[in-house]
Swiss-Prot record:
It comes from Plasmodium falciparum (isolate NF7 / Ghana). Residues 99-108, 590-614 have a biased composition (Low complexity). Glycans are attached at N42. The gene is SD17. This is Knob-associated histidine-rich protein. PANTHER family: CA-RESPONSIVE PROTEIN. InterPro entries: EMP3/KAHRP_N.
Length: 657
């Protein structure tokens, strides 16, 4: 920071004197010009004298100036002044031997001359006297009040008054574009298609035209300041009936759940990419529209959790919320930095925006593509977020996902199937996971990228893992241990941390790579799993079986996994999966995951291997994979699992009755 700061300071210092000079000169010129024009009318008297006195250099300079000004005459005088000041200064420095002294004189001289010249040039046919003021100076016509733009960007705000019409414009300093231009002739011409912000939104009697705004900015695409984040849904950005809106959604949710029943949930996972992103028309086509904005949180489905964690989520408004890890987003924010990253970061924004709100929207499109794509989107997001937020997003997304996913998956799947255990287990693990996730986040970034494939695996794994996790609450504690250990161990060691230390000294290092690779695989796996997740809860039962298989798969993973250690760990992962509880097992599993992840990477192609790897990864996911695989998985789990879980939860919760 310091070096940057200093650099900036230096740069600014260097630039500042010139800048100041320019301002001063321009001001002087402006004053002289004003006095000359106002007092002398034509300003010819001094101008000619000065002009006669001018040196050749000055004349040249003036010529340039004149030309320049003539060129810009159309601009407002104020604009002109700085411009000419700049020119003047430049020429003064360059052309005149005594720039400082001369500059002043020249400045005055020029000011008069300039004006005079200006008039003369502009209205050569008219005597100077006749042209009282250049049109640009006519305050009656147009007055521009400039507020210097701060160097470094931002907006230059200035007001223009046209007789009775007053506009506030915002001009982007970088590209000079105005959010509103001066073409409006009617004082009350508030919302023009081009310039919705011309009038204060709250100035209208009835408030801003939210519907029009929604049409114009359907998805809160104006959130330019939230680069890495999905923009908030309009619902969040505009004043007005959020609660009512949510109520609407809930009511719809109930109807939908009631009407669609479990089918809706099943239906949702298929749609989940869309539905999830939007809240999912999957839930109810009826609030597909609303869902786009709201569904994250508002949707009874898991969406809400991501979206509303703050709103509904904490209350557990949605199973999804749980899925999202309300604590990840909300509780976690407090207790779990990692989870917090997910939830809190978005929390502040309507948190869960990422998943819920805008994220949903994005996911929406991505998920539309498919869980995989959704994951891809999420991946992007994750990456984006990861890159942008780095840990945070990852944490949020990934970890949350990991957490949420592992939690959710665990929580969700387990939650659905073994909700209570899972939840407890998950919460603990999640908190832990969050920690480890943070550690892993960095890795996850790369992993995330790689994870896309792995995601699916991871999902499966997670599903399996979830089952396992749900199976063993103790494992959570262990897992926490594991996670912590992993965290302590560090990303690479994570694998190492417990059993990895034994098995994966070798694996640990590869494990880290593997994690990344595994992460990749996991992504794929996650995607694959996404499909699995669609049937997650059901899958969960299957997953449990799958988990057993996963254990078996772990053997497959042994084959699949490049590293025996990984395989051992994978085997261990069996234990871990079985254990899911013993931190050793879990850790081994996690370690295995690294190895397994290798396998997963290797097996990325093979779902079975991937699953196995994924399972191993899954343990890993709890720790590392939560970051990597979970990242991917999370997406699916979140979207689909959330949907499923949310639907189930709804059923359980009574959204559906």
């Amino acid at each position: 920071m310091k070096s940057f700061k200093n650099k900036n300071t230096l740069r600014r210092k260097k630039a500042f004197p010139v800048f100041t000079k320019i301002l001063l000169v321009s001001f002087l010129v402006w004053v002289l010009k004003c006095s000359n024009n106002c007092n002398n009318g034509n300003g010819s008297g001094d101008s000619f004298d000065f002009r006669n006195k001018r040196t050749l250099a000055q004349k040249q300079h003036e010529h340039h100036h004149h030309h320049h000004h003539h060129h810009h005459h159309q601009h407002q005088a104020p604009h002109q002044a700085p411009h000419q000041a700049h020119h003047h200064h430049h020429h003064g420095e360059v052309n005149h031997q005594a720039p400082q002294v001369h500059q002043q004189v020249h400045g005055q001289d020029q000011a008069h001359h300039h004006h005079h010249h200006h008039h003369h040039h502009l209205h050569p046919q008219q005597p100077q006297g006749t042209v009282a003021n250049p049109p640009s100076n006519e305050p009656v016509v147009k007055t521009q009040v400039f507020r210097e733009a701060r160097p470094g960007g931002g907006f230059k705000a200035y007001e223009e008054k046209y007789e009775s019409k007053h506009y506030k414009l915002k001009e982007n300093v970088v590209d000079g574009k105005k959010d509103c231009d001066e073409k409006y002739e009617a004082a009350n011409y508030a919302f023009s298609e081009e310039c919705p912000y011309t009038v204060n939104d709250y100035s209208q009697e009835n408030g801003p035209n939210i519907f029009a705004l929604r049409k114009r900015f359907p998805l809160g695409m104006n959130d330019e300041d939230e680069e890495g984040k999905e923009a908030l849904a309009i619902k969040d950005k505009l004043p007005g009936g959020l609660d009512e809106y949510q109520n609407q959604l809930y009511g719809i949710c109930n109807e939908t759940c009631t009407t669609c029943g479990p089918a809706a949930i099943d239906y949702v996972p298929a749609d989940a990419p869309n539905g999830y992103a939007y809240g999912g028309s999957a839930h109810d086509g009826s609030h597909g529209n609303l869902r786009g904005h709201d569904n994250k949180g508002s949707e009874g489905y898991g969406y809400e959790a991501p979206y509303n964690p703050g709103f509904n989520g904490a209350p557990g408004s949605n199973g999804m919320q749980n899925y999202v890890h309300p604590w990840s987003g909300y509780s976690a924010p407090y207790g779990v930095p990692h989870g917090a990253a997910h939830g809190s970061r978005y929390s502040s924004f309507s948190s869960v925006n990422k998943y819920g709100k805008h994220g949903d929207e994005k996911h929406h499109s991505s998920k539309k593509h498919e869980g995989n794509d959704g994951e891809g989107e999420k991946k992007k997001k994750s990456k984006k977020h990861k890159d942008h937020d780095g840990e945070k997003k990852k944490s949020k997304k990934h970890k949350d996902n990991e957490d949420a996913e592992s939690v959710k998956s665990k929580k969700h799947k387990s939650h659905d199937c073994e909700k209570k255990k899972s939840k407890k287990h998950k919460d603990n693990e999640d908190a832990e996971s969050v920690k480890s996730k943070k550690v892993l986040k960095k890795r996850e970034k790369s992993i995330m990228e790689k994870n896309h494939a792995a995601k699916k695996l991871t999902k499966k794994i997670k599903i399996k893992k979830k089952t396992n996790n749900s199976k063993s609450d103790g494992s959570k504690a262990h897992e926490k241990k594991e996670n912590e250990t992993k965290n302590t161990a560090g990303e690479n060691k994570k694998v190492d941390s417990t059993s990895a230390d034994n098995k994966s000294t070798n694996a640990a290092t590869p494990g880290a790579k593997d994690k990344t690779q595994g992460g990749k695989t996991d992504k794929t796996g996650a995607s694959t799993n996404a499909a699995t997740n669609k049937g997650q809860c059901a899958a969960e039962g299957a997953t449990k079986g799958a988990t057993k298989e996963a254990s078996t798969s772990k053997e497959a993973t042994k084959e699949a996994s490049t590293s025996k250690e990984a395989t051992k760990e994978a085997s261990t992962s069996k234990e871990a999966t079985k254990e899911a509880s013993t931190s050793k097992g879990a850790t081994k599993e996690a370690s295995t995951t690294e190895g397994a992840t290798k396998g997963a990477s290797t097996t990325a192609g093979s779902t079975t291997g991937a699953t196995t790897g994924a399972n191993a990864v899954q343990s890993k996911d709890e720790t590392a994979d939560k970051n990597a695989a979970n990242n991917g998985e999370q997406v699916m789990s979140r979207g689909q699992a959330q949907l499923q879980e949310a639907g189930k939860k709804k059923k359980k919760r009574g959204c559906c009755g």
